[in-house]
């Protein structure tokens, strides 16, 4: 059974604290703090700490409550954890008018610090889930998530995309933390990350994500757009506006963002002051922060977390509980742990790939057009040696054309695309060989000729063996002859009607295999030998006495 107690906490107020961390049995009281639930390993793979998530989301007090998941994401070293700790102060002191606390008290909660190196990795969740009464009286669970900053020096683009996408998929309120302005590259990165998240989700006809809040820190143009939500709304409307005179690429970015989120808003926040930015020993005391920042901070946090602003997490229109959120967490991380999704690429890599693929396509098209001129559909049959010679010449020209195109990525990067070009040209050459062979009347007649030879040979052997009393062999030859005759008729019907083409291909392959057992001369020699044997056996069986004197000189002549 859960125990509750009112404790003075480090955020300057009193709050109800629950010590129930398990759905099965009571455990000792644990101090609330950040818990790493998504771990990014050194090999850039991802691991979910299911035990930690179970303790947080399956607590008896919250597991069946509908959940509001608030996440802060954005570039590293832009104050995300710093902001999260003020959210914690508000959640612990909502009933207090001066919820920001003592001006001399250090800021604690999620780990943060000044400097240029990253602090948070993966995804962290505050271990205590807050129970809040909404305006309609429904009690909901509020989960606070802090995320690893994007584009730090130790993370790949896939790391950044996965963490951002996963936090967006899990959260009902995603705060996109930006510095100074909303630039075009910020929107492009948002497009990439949200698309990476949408790929991992099941197909839905609804907008896949809920609330997106652009939080612009260190806003320096209050004379254009005032601090706060109103100025932010006007600024964002201008920034995300789609107009006809925009380039198609810019329009697509904005349309994509609008198609992904149900609600989009913006808040402009001033700079916290030089002491915060330059003092290496700054520990979050309010007395060192500019008054203008504190004034707007007192507006921002309630604007984000007040009961009327809390959006319950929904997936495909269904409200999600803490228990359900745990299952989605597990399902989503399995997708990102696998190889089903394409790996996102840097702009340079994507551009270099497109550049090289375009060069491959151009060179391949050149080869194709010139080979069509040599042995295309209306061209006569070309000797195989001449065709091969022309192929080698045009292949060399295509490779030279590929190498002559200016490409991004360097020689090493382009080498595999050169190999791809050569491989595709060789495949085209095989098709041209088949097309050229089909124009050869002797090649086209190979299948019926082979079948006729088989029929004739089996007919002769059947006659001879039947005559000398080897009825079993004769019957076998007759059966083979009959089957071959049926095969020949079937092949003729397939060629005439165009039906059962797969069966026709099998017949051609069998005939080709028989043909390849020997040249045409060898086949004719076998026919001649069979005929001569048949004639010799007939003379032995039916001697002609009157003819013997005349035959004797003939034998001598031979």
UniProtKB/Swiss-Prot annotation:
It holds the Pfam family GBP. Signal peptide: none annotated. Residues 1-34 are annotated as: N-terminal hypervariable region (HVR). The modification N6-acetyllysine is found at residue 395. It catalyses: GTP + H2O = GDP + phosphate + H(+). Residues 412-439 form a coiled coil. The keyword Cytoplasm does not apply. Residues 64-309 form the GB1/RHD3-type G domain. Residues 347-438 are annotated as: 3HB (three-helix bundle) domain. Its main location: endoplasmic reticulum. It is found in: Endoplasmic reticulum membrane; Golgi apparatus membrane; Cell projection, Axon. It is a multi-pass membrane protein. Residues 521-558 are annotated as: Autoinhibitory domain. The modification Phosphoserine is found at residues 10, 22-23. Residues 471 are lumenal. Belongs to the TRAFAC class dynamin-like GTPase superfamily. GB1/RHD3 GTPase family. GB1 subfamily. Monomeric and homodimeric. The homodimer, transiently formed by two molecules on opposing membranes, is the active form mediating ER membrane fusion. Interacts with REEP1, REEP5, RTN3 and RTN4 (via the transmembrane region); these proteins are involved in endoplasmic reticulum tubular network organization. Interacts with ZFYVE27; both proteins are involved in endoplasmic reticulum tubular network organization. Interacts with ARL6IP1; both proteins are involved in endoplasmic reticulum tubular network organization. This is Atlastin-1. It comes from Mus musculus.
């Amino acid at each position: 059974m859960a125990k509750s107690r009112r404790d003075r906490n480090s955020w300057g107020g009193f709050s109800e604290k629950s010590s129930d961390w398990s759905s099965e049995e009571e455990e000792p009281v644990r101090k609330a703090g950040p818990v790493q639930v998504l771990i990014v390993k050194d090999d850039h793979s991802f691991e979910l700490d299911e035990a930690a998530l179970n303790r947080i989301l399956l607590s008896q007090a919250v597991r069946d409550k509908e959940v509001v998941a608030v996440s802060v994401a954005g570039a590293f070293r832009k104050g995300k954890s710093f902001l999260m700790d003020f959210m914690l102060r508000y959640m612990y002191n909502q009933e207090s008018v001066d919820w920001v606390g003592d001006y001399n008290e250090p800021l604690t909660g999620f780990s943060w610090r000044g400097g240029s190196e990253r602090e948070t990795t993966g995804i962290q969740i505050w271990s205590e889930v807050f129970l809040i009464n909404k305006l309609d009286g429904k009690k909901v669970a509020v989960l606070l998530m802090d995320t690893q900053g994007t584009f730090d020096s130790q993370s790949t683009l896939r790391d950044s995309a996965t963490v951002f996408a996963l936090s967006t998929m899990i959260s009902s309120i995603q705060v996109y933390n930006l510095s100074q302005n909303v630039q075009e590259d910020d929107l492009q990165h948002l497009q990439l990350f949200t698309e990476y998240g949408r790929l991992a989700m099941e197909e839905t006809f609804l907008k896949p994500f809920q609330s997106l809040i652009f939080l612009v820190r260190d806003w320096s143009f209050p004379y254009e757009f005032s601090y706060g939500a109103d100025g932010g709304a006007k600024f964002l409307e201008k920034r995300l506006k789609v107009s006809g005179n925009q380039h198609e690429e810019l329009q697509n970015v904005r349309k994509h963002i609008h198609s992904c989120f149900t609600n989009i808003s913006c808040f402009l926040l001033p700079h916290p002051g030089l002491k915060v930015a330059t003092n290496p020993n700054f520990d979050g005391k309010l007395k060192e922060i500019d008054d203008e920042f504190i004034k707007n901070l007192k507006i921002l946090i309630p604007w984000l977390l007040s009961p009327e602003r809390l959006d319950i997490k929904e997936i495909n229109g269904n409200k999600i509980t803490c228990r359900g959120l745990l299952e989605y967490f597990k399902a989503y991380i399995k997708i990102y742990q696998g190889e089903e999704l394409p790996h996102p690429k840097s702009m340079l890599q994507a551009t270099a790939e497109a550049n090289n693929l375009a060069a491959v396509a151009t060179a391949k098209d050149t080869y194709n057009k010139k080979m069509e001129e040599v042995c295309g559909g209306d061209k006569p049959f070309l000797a195989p040696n001449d065709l091969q010679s022309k192929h080698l010449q045009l292949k060399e020209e295509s490779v030279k054309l590929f190498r002559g195109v200016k490409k991004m990525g360097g020689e090493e990067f382009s080498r595999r695309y050169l190999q791809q070009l050569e491989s595709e040209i060789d495949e085209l050459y095989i098709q041209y060989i088949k097309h050229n062979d089909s124009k050869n009347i002797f090649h086209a007649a190979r299948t019926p000729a082979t079948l006729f030879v088989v029929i004739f040979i089996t007919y002769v052997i059947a006659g001879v063996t039947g005559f000398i009393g080897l009825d079993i062999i004769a019957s076998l030859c007759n059966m083979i002859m009959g089957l071959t005759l049926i095969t020949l008729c079937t092949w003729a019907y397939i060629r005439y009607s165009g039906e059962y083409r797969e069966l026709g291909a099998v017949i051609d392959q069998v005939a080709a295999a028989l043909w390849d057992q020997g040249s045409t001369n060898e086949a004719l020699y076998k026919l001649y030998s069979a005929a001569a044997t048949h004639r010799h056996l007939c003379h032995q069986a039916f001697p002609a006495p009157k003819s013997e004197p005349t035959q004797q000189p003939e034998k001598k002549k031979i």
